Amino acid sequence: MANLVIRPMELTDIDQVVDVEIAVFDVPWSEDIFYQEVAENKFAYYFVIEIDEVIVGYAGLWVVIDDAQITNIAISPSYRGYKLGEKLFGFTMEQAIRLGGKRLSLEVRVSNIIAQRMYRKFGLVPGGLRKRYYTDNQEDAIVMWVNL
């Protein structure tokens, strides 16, 4: 990949981030939600991954005291298969540690085996199940976590 950068999300990135969101998720977040997260949520940290100044993915992280939670992570479908998700996830984990996180957790669809495999590479293990967690199809979510 040519010029790859991972950096904090800025308000001016939201349009491109929403484009990724719409391409990836059946029930995408709105511009307003991203604005609130980036501009107003003091516990939230969002990052973008860009190639040649084009945003191709993003990740969200909340850190409350020493508890870190991945809120979302997405890579544009046309950029999958290049390990960008791993790069972005690893960077986000490093930021969680830097921000004082001692534990990291996330939810992942039961059907998303590829994501579960990637999270396991980073040491996350299943810790529970949230029944009917996803509103689009009532799919269960596996809660995964790791000590940082």
Across the structure, where does each feature detected by a protein language model lie?
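Conserved catalytic-core motifs of GNAT/GCN5-like acyltransferases
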Residues: 107, 120, 125-142
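Active-site acidic-Proline motif in GNAT/NAT acetyltransferases
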Residues: 76-78, 82, 110-112
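Short glycine/proline-centered loop/turn elements that form peptide/ligand docking sites
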Residues: 85, 89, 111-115, 132-137
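Conserved acetyl-CoA-binding loop-helix of GNAT-fold acetyltransferases
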Residues: 81-94, 117-121
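Extreme N-terminal starter segment of soluble prokaryotic enzymes
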Residues: 3-5
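Conserved hydrophobic beta-strand within the GNAT/NAT acetyltransferase core sheet
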Residues: 70, 104-108
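Acetyl-CoA-dependent GNAT
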Residues: 8-78, 89-91, 95, 99, ...
